[in-house]
């Protein structure tokens, strides 16, 4: 049966995902940045309260995946922290200036991760040559690759995802970006073994008083009175679709 991973941005969302049938959580911060490393406090609270596998993302900033020496040092330290806290896996990825896997740095990450299952995230979708990259990731011992098939969403990239799945000795290919209940059957019919979804929506802040003349963001148009939350009903619906597909 296909595995359902839910992207969560808080301990509360991780619990919601678990309670509604998620098989695994990718734990992140900063949804508007596409997911950054969670704080130590969030990591500890999730580790204490969530019983399904949780894989934190290790990504020090938004933007591209070519990191400075200081950023890479932080990545290694965060990998060690996640390992010490007892998480079963993590999510990360590093590219070089030419859009290839930065093999020396990824080798250091794999050494720091030790027995943890490492997912190479959507840095894969920014790489120059996906099949060569897949070979490199297999050589590193990467457990799985999260990808949209190098398109803006995974449904558009499904043909590439199927090509990657068919590649000999490839890591597990997990489809993600825009995967929802209404299109999930396309991925299941294509033989995708793992799917990744945020399964959520922006929810209004409970704050009643709002100083509309002041922003804490560098983006003057940002809505600072909303937060992204996992929709438990959406998770349950996706899990039900997977179970019914398996029963066919």
Curated annotation (Swiss-Prot):
Record carries keyword Secreted: no
Origin: domain of life: Bacteria
Family annotation (InterPro entries): CutC-like (IPR005627), CutC-like_dom_sf (IPR036822)
A GO CC term assigned to this protein in UniProt: cytoplasm
Keywords: Cytoplasm
Gene3D superfamilies per the UniProt record, alphabetical: Copper homeostasis (CutC) domain (3.20.20.380)
Pfam family, one: CutC
Record's subcellular location: Cytoplasm
SS bond partners: none
Classification via HAMAP family: CutC
Subunit structure: Homodimer.
Protein's UniProt name: PF03932 family protein CutC
Protein's organism: Escherichia coli O9:H4 (strain HS)
Gene behind this protein: cutC
């Amino acid at each position: 049966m296909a595995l359902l991973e839910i992207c969560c941005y808080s301990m509360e969302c991780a619990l919601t995902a678990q309670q509604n049938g998620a098989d695994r959580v990718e734990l992140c911060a900063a949804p508007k940045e596409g997911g950054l490393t969670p704080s130590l406090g969030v990591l500890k609270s999730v580790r204490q309260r969530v019983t399904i596998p949780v894989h934190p993302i290790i990504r020090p900033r938004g933007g591209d995946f070519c990191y400075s020496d200081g950023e890479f040092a932080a990545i290694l330290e965060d990998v060690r922290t996640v390992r010490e806290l007892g998480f079963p896996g993590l999510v990360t990825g590093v590219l070089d200036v030419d859009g290839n896997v930065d093999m020396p740095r990824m080798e250091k990450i794999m050494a720091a991760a030790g027995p943890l299952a490492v997912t190479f995230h959507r840095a894969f979708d920014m790489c120059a040559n996906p099949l060569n990259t897949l070979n490199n990731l297999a050589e590193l011992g990467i457990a799985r690759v999260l990808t949209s098939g190098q398109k803006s969403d995974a449904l558009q990239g499904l043909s590439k995802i199927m090509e990657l799945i068919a590649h000999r000795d490839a890591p597990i290919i997990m489809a993600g970006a825009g995967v929802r209940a209404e299109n999930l059957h396309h991925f299941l019919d294509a033989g995708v073994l793992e799917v990744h979804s945020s399964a959520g929506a922006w929810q209004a802040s409970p704050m009643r008083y709002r100083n509309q003349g002041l922003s804490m963001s560098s983006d003057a148009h940002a809505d600072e009175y909303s937060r992204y939350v996992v929709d438990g009903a959406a998770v349950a619906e996706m899990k039900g679709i997977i179970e019914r597909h398996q029963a066919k």
